[in-house]
């Protein structure tokens, strides 16, 4: 009899593998959020809106006349833009500073100088970011500007009448509330990474994914896990619990993208109602290059926002615009011979 029972219960490896595969499709007990894209039409409309040009990007070929350099020296990266008199970007750079922002800035200036055609020159320069003072002094730049003002000027150029600017980088996050062209309030997060890009980078690595693969997985999610808005330490336990309950990698990735945005909105900005953001919202910073984060932001705030095609360069662009704004024909321009490093 025992032999008959064994025969009836015997299963092939293929049967077992199929059962395991079917487990993936079982609904998890963990609460879920709306999918980032309920329909393919939603995805197509999103792509059409966010993959268009906002700032014209040209080249140095045939460039003539005065040009204006903006350098944004961040904690780990350095960004630079060179704009012409029409405010078009003709050269840009986004790179890590490799622990020496001043050396990185010098290399940027040297690259530009070597590529500038005859008849074109750097008429005025401006620095912003964490390393504003160091770069301004070390390179003998014309001026520095606080990064909030640099980001505002860049956003205003992209979306005139901007009412809110949200900038999420790898390590920090900035929020500007603007009314009638005046910055009303500022919120900055520099203590916790749970509302920043490094939060996602950490979890992507723990899942064995590149950030690009992580983003694609999130975009393909059908039942994003509701992981709440918690710090990185506690989020680890939430993710492990969701995995135990059968949540897919895609649904966890999307849930983490939602969490980053919720942390930014409700813990840093302390938003009570999405109407507080106003009607013209510009998002920028490297983290918003992640389409899943951008989409989660739109769904949570119930509004379409503008992500410039230079989302990671907006501080540098605003600094370049500042340099152009303060330019006069009597300025000497940037003298590379003064730089010794």
Residue ranges, per PLM feature:
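Glycine-rich phosphate-binding loop of actin/hexokinase-like ATP-binding domains
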Residues: 1-4, 92-97, 143-208, 307-310
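Glycine-rich phosphate-binding loops at beta-strand->alpha-helix junctions
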Residues: 1-3, 130-131, 259, 272-298, ...
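Short, small-residue-biased leader/transition segments that mark boundaries at the very start
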Residues: 2-9, 341
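N-terminal glycine/serine-rich phosphate-binding loop of ATP-dependent small-molecule kinases
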Residues: 11-147, 279, 295-309, 329-335
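Phosphate/ATP-binding catalytic cores across multiple sugar-kinase/actin-like superfamilies
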Residues: 48-57, 255-277
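Conserved phosphate-binding catalytic cores of ATP/NTP-utilizing and phosphoryl-transfer enzymes
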Residues: 48-64, 132-169, 174-179, 185, ...
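Conserved ATP-utilizing enzyme core subdomain
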Residues: 194, 201, 205, 210-243
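Adenine-nucleotide phosphate-binding core of ATP-dependent small-molecule kinases
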Residues: 237-266
